[in-house]
UniProtKB/Swiss-Prot annotation:
Zn(2+) 1 binds at H147, H149, H234, D258. This is Gamma-lactamase MBL1. Induction: Expression is induced in response to 2-benzoxasolinone (BOA) exposure. Gamma-lactamase; part of the Fusarium detoxification of benzoxazolinone cluster 1 (FDB1) involved in the degradation of benzoxazolinones produced by the host plant. Maize, wheat, and rye produce the 2 benzoxazinone phytoanticipins 2,4-dihy-droxy-7-methoxy-1,4-benzoxazin-3-one (DIMBOA) and 2,4-dihydroxy-1,4-benzoxazin-3-one (DIBOA) that, due to their inherent instability once released, spontaneously degrade to the more stable corresponding benzoxazolinones, 6-methoxy-2-benzoxazolinone (MBOA) and 2-benzoxazolinone (BOA), respectively. InterPro entries: MBL_superfamily_lactonases, Metallo-B-lactamas, RibonucZ/Hydroxyglut_hydro. Zn(2+) 2 binds at D151, H152, D258, H351. Disruption phenotype: Impairs the ability to of metabolize 2-benzoxazolinone (BOA) and thus growth BOA-amended media. GO terms for molecular function: hydrolase activity; metal ion binding. Keywords: Hydrolase, Metal-binding, Zinc. One of its GO terms (biological process) is secondary metabolite biosynthetic process. Fusarium verticillioides possesses 2 unlinked loci, FDB1 and FDB2, necessary for detoxification of antimicrobial compounds produced by maize, including 2-benzoxazolinone (BOA). The FDB2 cluster arose as a duplication of the FDB1 cluster with rearrangement and expansion by incorporating additional genes. Coiled coil: none annotated. Pathway: Xenobiotic degradation.
Length: 399
């Protein structure tokens, strides 16, 4: 594989920072064994206009951090276009965000959301966003659901019956039939009525046995331009995807869905240690007088293990959490870190608020993300979700 490991050349083990904290050289990540290819897909990141707030963070992450008790924010999905696949899937969607009329979701879900005081706002559904930009919805051959949760399945009924719904392994056994046939289900079975519900079986599909990194993979178009990845844990059959965005240099976008809910679940790592100086300053949007850079040491001080090489969070194992299996989710996240270690692979998880103001969204393409340094500009942006008044974080502001 032509991808090269992320190098942080300012991290040299023989030197010390001014506060005498050791500086750590990144470890070399394992080869991901991505086959060479001259084929790419066009990718755009869709701002689904969904905004969720007042969801309890304890139901997603552990440990809780000061100022980080609420899960809130955006919801990204993707449109993938293959120039000449020769099949109905020339245009794909990966996730749909939240349906605009979310109160028409299954009754048990809506009742639970309202009882919990959670808030959901949606300006437009993805179908409307596409039509507003001149797209013919009949061109969309399939919708890949990363998983079945409300903020990813959208409303498939806004697409014609020729658009398939594509799900991960185990979905049908776990979730079919759904609401209203199963009155306790949180999934509306009308999503796949009158259309094909395709469940990917990584063991049986053509090219079985393929692995990209440690993930079971499906070469979706058969030309190395787009891989669907098996990333279970958050739910049964959770899917991610890897899209080749350029050939020279080879670059990729990792479409994460909810493989993680916050950057601190997969950063820092031995492959990507917390740097001595973080640039740009993650607090530059919320502090009145932010310094240009931010000392990494202030975040080490609030890390659960005072570590520069371990993620800040794990998927929570608390009763009532939103994960099907937190331990399996953690294993998928650990596999993700090997992808994130490469400078030319850009993981985009659905709820990464730090991407706003940096990335281009649909209808603009995302294929030039590497040339525009989106990963460099957003790698540590999630740190701004911590309360800057907590402990030593005030050092992020100018004196």
């Amino acid at each position: 594989m032509l991808t090269s490991p992320l190098r942080q050349d300012h991290l040299v083990p023989e030197t010390l920072m001014a506060d005498a904290s050791p500086i750590i050289r990144p470890e070399t990540p394992p080869d991901l064994h991505i086959p060479d290819s001259q084929a790419t897909v066009k990718v755009s990141i869709i701002d689904t206009t969904s905004y969720m707030s007042n969801f309890p963070m304890w139901a997603f992450l552990d440990p809780l951090m000061p100022g980080h008790e609420e899960m809130k924010g955006c919801d990204f999905s993707f449109i993938i276009e293959h120039p000449k696949s020769g099949n109905k899937y020339d245009t794909l969607l990966f996730d749909l965000g939240v349906r605009k009329d979310w109160e028409n979701l299954p009754t048990p879900f809506v009742q639970g959301i309202k009882a919990g005081g959670c808030k959901i706002e949606v300006q437009k559904d993805v179908a409307t966003i596409l039509k507003d930009n001149g797209r013919d919805l009949s061109e969309v051959g399939g919708i890949i659901w990363s998983h079945w949760h409300f903020d990813h399945v959208g409303d498939a009924q806004t697409f014609p019956g020729t658009t398939d719904v594509i799900v991960g392994p185990g979905f049908k056994k776990a979730h079919v039939p759904a609401w209203p046939t199963d009155p306790e289900s949180h999934i509306d079975e009308k999503a796949w009525q009158g259309r094909t519900l395709r469940e990917i079986d990584f063991a049986a599909e053509e090219g079985k046995g393929l692995k990209i990194g440690q993930f079971d993979a499906l070469d979706f178009y058969g030309d190395g331009s787009f891989y669907v990845l098996n990333t279970p844990g958050h739910t049964i059959g959770h899917l991610s995807a890897l899209a080749r965005t350029t050939v020279d240099p080879p670059t990729f976008i990792f479409m994460g869905g909810d493989i993680a809910h916050q950057g601190g679940e997969f950063r820092p790592t031995p492959y990507m240690p917390l740097p001595a100086e973080i640039s740009p300053n993650p607090f530059n949007r919320i502090l009145p007088r932010p310094a240009l850079t931010c000392p990494g040491e202030i975040f080490v001080e609030i890390h659960r293990n005072k570590s520069r090489t371990e993620p800040f969070f794990d998927p929570t194992t608390a009763e009532g959490a939103w994960h099907h299996c937190a331990h399996e989710a953690k294993r998928s996240i650990d596999k993700l870190t090997e992808f994130d270690a490469y400078e030319n692979i850009f993981p985009v998880i659905a709820h990464d608020n730090s991407l706003y103001g940096v990335i281009d969204v649909y209808p603009k393409p995302a294929n030039d993300w590497f040339a525009k340094s989106w990963k460099d500009k957003t790698r540590w942006g999630w740190l701004n979700e911590f309360d800057p008044s907590f402990a030593g974080l005030a050092k992020a502001s100018e004196p």
